[in-house]
């Protein structure tokens, strides 16, 4: 345990004496001395750590203060920018008015007025400086006086509004501009003082490093954190206060398809009495409209293809043909809320998002959501929805699953408008006039040409008669495994096709029992969502489109389904497809707003309809194949003449269009919107109906072949069946997540839906 050559005890003293008297030797530290030295160094490091911590806290406080001033300045800058554009627009309009009035003056006065107008336009810098000096910057004011004035001008602070329409009264604009400039001066003064203080601190540290500076053995000084921050003038901003962090696939989406998952919600189907459209409450009480998404903003997000990789929308000149503008209110919010709503994404096209998005906002824009659903459901902002979890169309501001589904588009919730009596035995009872005795608010309104809204008195046969369903029964649940953004059912009603992420699965629903896919058609990229799939009438070919520039045509007649052709366009995504009645032509709605016409026999691009200024989200074709109806994230529905290749009509709305359907018997067009409303328009008259049962974006819509009823689905997890055209509610089904897509069989016997909880549901329609 001890060295064997240690000298005997009686010799140690003499050895020590000899050592003391001998030549000096190197200092040898004992263990206690070493421990004391380590303790001192530890205490020094601890002190250094403490000083660095205090400095870090100080810097954090300064950062918070600077950010607060930055936000304040941003609000002021935004207000000034809006005011500048507003005044510019006013000047343009006044100039036009002057130009129109001059010809009415006498010849001698015309020249004088023209010269006076020209003189008024010649504003010199001296005049500008004089005006600014008088109105905004009294030279004698000190910084403290400016601060006091700034505080008085900004109590409360300027609201950062999403739309110019919500600015203050013009009379307040000047005060707002003046106070904004004063606030900016205060910000500059504060920044100058702060920089001076930091420079002084840095100089002091250079002279006396003190305990907050580490010194290396070679005499070099280790820079402190504040030294680094002061010298690194090009550092990136650490945080973006208004940005959205899409940290996972489940939260991300191009256009923010927005999907709400609530597995606890049971499936339920309710039938309602036709007499439940009360007339005692003609105006609906709704929650405040959702905040504008960057798209509408886009969902937009985000089923707005919400909201969030935003694909810059291709700004195309609107078709030159005169459009039929809808002059009647488009929604209840038109009557009660000022200005357009905004996605996301785009809503944050979002988004503030993407919109978000979308929101597929959508989120088509929002986002393929919301903020958003489709990509960003339709806010589509754009071609790929990456969420592993539930997303849904609101990225139109479909919100794709990453859509925020949206942002997109975000959630556009509103309070329930109607409470239904589920007893079907009430169907045959009741007069044609909805009785106010029920005390239930109306959900269906007729809008006349002059914009007057009145609750619809349903006829006695609204829910009875040939071809009108009584309810629907859930028949099969098809566990696809990914968010189901597209569904279709074959004419034979034996096979159902469900489109999810990167593939279409084929299901045989002709037999009872647990269902497994009989085939899987891999198309697009593995991480891109299928947005639409359409069967040709003969059932031998399937066309698939989605978050890619290529459409795939599958040969289903071969022993093993295979791709027999691919159609490639310049747009990064396809949101919807339609097939002509003769199956010779395919129409695809693109994320750049164009409608591409494909010759299926020669597999070539025939023409493009240009008019939508944002993604085209939905499409339907008339029964005779002569007219095409399209809806877009630019808040318009357009009708195209397929024989002449031109636009016939245009209807403008205050909300992004996520879905539409044209009645097979003609005359009526149903439009589902991000605002949660459905509008049923007469194609040749100004009359229309507004339906208010959905509580969030209407993501899909499909007419029955008989034309007497149609179904709609939404982000509120609902499947609603409606009577054409006045919208009496036939039945309603509640699913466990956002219902992104639907289809009705050609014999009107089955309904298929695709939802955000990664499954499709087959319903049997009971008559």
UniProtKB/Swiss-Prot annotation:
**Annotated Polar residues bias:** 324-346
Keyword match Ubl conjugation: yes
**GO terms for MF:** transcription corepressor activity
| Low complexity composition-biased segments | 294-306
Q: Where is the signal peptide?
A: none
Entry similarity comment: Belongs to the WD repeat Groucho/TLE family.
Q: What is this protein called in UniProt?
A: Transducin-like enhancer protein 1
Q: Which organism is it from?
A: Xenopus laevis
Q: Which gene encodes it?
A: esg1
């Amino acid at each position: 345990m001890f060295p064997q050559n240690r000298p005997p005890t009686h010799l140690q003293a003499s050895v020590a004496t000899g050592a003391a008297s001998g030549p000096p030797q190197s200092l040898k530290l004992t263990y206690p001395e070493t421990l004391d030295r380590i303790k001192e160094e530890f205490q020094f490091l601890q002190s250094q750590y403490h000083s660095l911590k205090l400095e870090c806290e100080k810097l954090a406080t300064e950062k918070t203060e600077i950010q607060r001033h930055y936000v304040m300045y941003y609000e002021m800058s935004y207000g000034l920018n809006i005011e500048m554009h507003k005044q510019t627009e006013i000047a343009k309009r006044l100039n036009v008015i002057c130009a129109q009035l001059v010809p009415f003056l006498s010849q001698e006065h015309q020249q004088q007025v023209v010269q006076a107008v020209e003189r008024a336009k010649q504003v010199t810098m001296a005049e500008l400086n004089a005006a600014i000096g008088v109105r905004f910057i009294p030279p004698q004011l000190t910084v403290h006086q400016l601060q006091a004035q700034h505080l008085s001008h900004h109590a409360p602070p300027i609201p950062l509004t999403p739309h110019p329409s919500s600015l203050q009264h013009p009379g307040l604009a000047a005060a707002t501009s003046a106070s904004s400039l004063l606030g900016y001066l205060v910000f500059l003064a504060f920044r100058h003082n702060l920089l001076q203080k930091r420079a002084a601190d840095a100089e002091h540290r250079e002279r006396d490093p003190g305990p907050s500076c580490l010194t290396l053995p070679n005499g070099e000084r280790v820079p402190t954190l504040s030294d680094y921050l002061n010298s690194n003038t090009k550092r990136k901003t650490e945080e973006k206060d208004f940005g959205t962090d899409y940290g996972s696939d489940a939260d991300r989406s191009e256009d923010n398809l927005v999907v709400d998952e609530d597995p606890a919600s049971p499936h339920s189907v309710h039938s309602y009495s036709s007499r439940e459209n009360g007339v005692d409450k003609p105006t609906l009480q709704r929650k405040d409209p959702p905040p504008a998404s960057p798209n509408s903003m886009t969902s937009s997000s985000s089923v707005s293809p919400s909201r969030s990789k935003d694909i810059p929308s291709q700004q195309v000149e609107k078709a030159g043909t005169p459009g039929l503008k809808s002059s009647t209110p488009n929604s209840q919010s038109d009557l009660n809320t000022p200005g357009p709503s905004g996605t996301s994404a785009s809503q944050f096209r979002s988004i503030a998002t993407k919109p978000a998005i979308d929101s597929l906002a959508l989120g088509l824009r929002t986002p393929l959501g919301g903020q958003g659903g489709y990509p960003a459901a339709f806010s589509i902002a754009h071609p790929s929805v990456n969420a592993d979890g539930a997303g849904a169309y609101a990225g139109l501001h479909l919100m794709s699953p990453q859509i925020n589904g949206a942002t997109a588009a975000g959630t556009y919730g509103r309070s329930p408008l109607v409470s239904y009596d589920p007893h079907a035995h009430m169907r045959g009872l009741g007069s044609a006039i909805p009785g106010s005795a029920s005390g239930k608010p109306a959900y269906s309104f007729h809008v006349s040409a002059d914009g007057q809204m009145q609750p619809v008195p349903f006829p006695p046969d609204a829910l009875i008669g040939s071809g009108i369903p009584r309810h629907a029964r859930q028949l099969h649940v098809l566990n696809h495994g990914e968010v189901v953004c597209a569904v279709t059912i074959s004419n034979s009603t034996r096979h159902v096709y469900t489109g999810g992420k990167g593939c279409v699965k084929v299901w045989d629903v002709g037999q009872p029992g647990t269902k497994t896919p009989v085939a899987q058609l891999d198309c697009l990229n593995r991480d891109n969502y299928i947005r639409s799939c359409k069967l040709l009438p003969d059932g031998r070919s399937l066309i698939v489109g989605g978050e890619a520039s290529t459409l795939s045509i599958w040969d289903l007649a071969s022993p093993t389904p295979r791709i027999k052709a691919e159609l490639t366009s310049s747009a990064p995504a396809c949101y919807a497809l339609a097939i002509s009645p003769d199956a010779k032509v395919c129409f695809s709605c693109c994320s750049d707003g164009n409608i591409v016409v494909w010759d299926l026999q020669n597999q070539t691009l025939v023409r493009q309809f240009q008019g939508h200024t944002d993604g085209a989200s939905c499409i339907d074709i008339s029964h005779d194949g002569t007219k095409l109806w399209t809806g877009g994230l630019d808040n318009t529905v357009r009708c195209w003449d397929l024989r002449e290749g031109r636009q016939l009509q245009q209807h403008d709305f205050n909300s992004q269009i996520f879905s539409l359907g044209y009645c097979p018997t003609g005359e009526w067009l149903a439009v589902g919107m991000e605002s949660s409303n459905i509008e049923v328009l007469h194609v040749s008259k100004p009359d229309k109906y507004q339906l208010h049962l959905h509580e969030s974006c209407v993501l899909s819509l499909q007419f029955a072949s008989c034309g007497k009823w149609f179904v709609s689905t939404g982000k509120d997890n609902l499947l609603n069946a409606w009577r054409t055209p006045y919208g009496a509610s036939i039945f309603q089904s509640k699913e466990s997540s956002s219902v992104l897509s639907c289809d009705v069989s050609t014999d009107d016997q089955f309904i298929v839906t695709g939802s955000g909880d990664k499954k499709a549901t087959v319903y049997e329609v009971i008559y």
